[in-house]
Amino acid sequence: VIVLDCSPARDSNSANVGEGQLGRGLLLRYHDRSMLSFPELIAYQEEMAKKAKVKTQYFSSPGGTDAGAFHKSGEGVLTLTHCICARNLHTCSTILDVEDYLAAKKTLITLLNDFDQTRLNKLKGVRR
């Protein structure tokens, strides 16, 4: 399952440091309160971003996404959160960087074109 989502930017203070900055590309969301991402799936996402020639940034969140519910369903489901960050989430004035959006879109298309049964079997076989 690939969950498309938006995470809160953490670049609104004067220090402009930390994970989740506008203009820094696709978020490689490796942890949140609802799931621990599958390391090999994050590595694959990063590989596809490099292939698509887009910027990425690692991201951990105290919040969660719908990915958590998928991740824990049944016997567990390989789940990837494909995100960008934005300011003022859940308001009528959310701000995002269009280049981040385009980076996420380009990476997703690259990943979907590359993904096949062989890749799925390889990912599923890693933890057995």
Region locations from a protein language model:
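Active-site-adjacent substrate-binding region
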Residues: 24-105, 111-128
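Acidic/histidine-rich catalytic neighborhood of metal-dependent amide-processing enzymes
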Residues: 1-27, 119-123
